[in-house]
Amino acid sequence: MSIENKDNINKIVLAYSGGLDTSIIAKWLQDTYDAEVITFTADIGQGEEVEPARAKAEAMGIKHIHIEDLRAEFARDYVFPMFRANAIYEGEYLLGTSIARPLIAKRLVEIAKEHNADAISHGATGKGNDQVRFELGAIALAPDVKTIAPWREWDLSSRESLMAYAKEHNIPIDFAANKKKSPYSMDANLLHISYEGDILEDPYAEAEDDMWRWSVSPEQAPDTPEYLELEYEKGDIVAINGEKLEPYEVMIKLNELGGKHGIGRLDIVENRYVGMKSRGCYETPAGTIMLKAHRGMESLTLDREAAHLKDELMPRYAKIIYNGYWFSPERQMLQALIDKSQEYVTGTVRVKLYKGNVSVVGRKSPYSLFDEKIATFEDDAGAYDQKDAEGFIRLNGLRLSIEASRGRDLS
């Protein structure tokens, strides 16, 4: 909504991190809209304490403060369903930021309804994808709740102007800590941590090694490989090395192990939904292992044509999530197909972690479609008649022979 349209805005629910940007937004909303601000802080595995956000909100006179641990819901209802699809955007990006936004949008509008709030607000800039993801999610779930995006309204355009605003309005910010803060714009959750800005704005400049926070460089990783056994039930990992774990615990464990072995680093230039190209670096240790292992499990248990159909639909599914349409009929339709495909994706995958690489080295399943009697290079005892291949080839080559008989050059 535009800044001119401020009538009847009495309560606003703000997605609040406790950092510089959202602390300034909280004060700006109070002053600009003369409205009560309610804060919502989500723990989705970013690895930082979220409780300090409470003290900062209280210092600004916020009366209703929501701080919630959403790690279990995030992993169970968002990340794991997405990984059943083997979703990758533009061939590389594992959608770590994209998949976190729908849950936050969902809780924002739910809290708004609990408090009879008129609007929600977020700290996403007007250049990025997150504004789209937050707002499309809110529209899908609560079209009557308005969204306020301060970065599209105010005239604060730099970190210096934000710091000046904070000082002028006595906003509780640790200015010394902010000056020492990483030069990169970072975002983290259970699935990944992302880095943008500073030297990364030059797509030819290599990221400095001290930027990476979750993983060692592959060169510094252990010289001895580590093997893991991942147990699957209907497309989801349920245990690691025999230890039963909840989805969020699986991700914590795999992030730790993958990071130790330098797995999951990515440096890409991607096409944002809003139209521009952006360079980002990502660490996704757990996701990298999960994707490789899941494909290994599917290779044993999925029918060929079902697997190929999934592969054809995967880019569309990934694009839907990247662009912010998690709450959409097309995503629901594809999810139903994907979930059906996982009915027999059950068993164990053995992977090897070594110096930035994850390799599937074994797989087994009670629903395996691998028939050793048929596939063997030894005597198959009549399980497969090789003479049948002649008719198969003749029929599949029929159209080619007709083309050739008409004098068409197929070379």
Swiss-Prot record:
Reaction(s) catalysed (UniProt annotation): L-citrulline + L-aspartate + ATP = 2-(N(omega)-L-arginino)succinate + AMP + diphosphate + H(+)
Enzyme class: ligase
Keyword annotations from UniProtKB, A to Z: Amino-acid biosynthesis, Arginine biosynthesis, ATP-binding, Cytoplasm, Ligase, Nucleotide-binding
Pfam families, per database record: Arginosuc_syn_C, Arginosuc_synth
This protein's record includes keyword Cytoplasm: yes
Residues reported to bind ATP: A15, Y16, S17, G18, G19, L20, D21, T22, S23, A42, G123
Major localization class: cytoplasm
GO biological process, one term: L-arginine biosynthetic process
Molecular function in Gene Ontology: argininosuccinate synthase activity; ATP binding
Gene3D superfamilies with a match to the protein in the record: Argininosuccinate synthetase, chain A, domain 2, HUPs, Single helix bin
Sequence positions that bind L-aspartate: T125, N129, D130
Compartments where located: Cytoplasm
Binding site for L-citrulline: Y93, S98, N129, R133, S185, S194, E270, Y282
Family according to the record: Belongs to the argininosuccinate synthase family. Type 1 subfamily.
Assembly notes: Homotetramer.
Protein name: Argininosuccinate synthase
Gene: argG
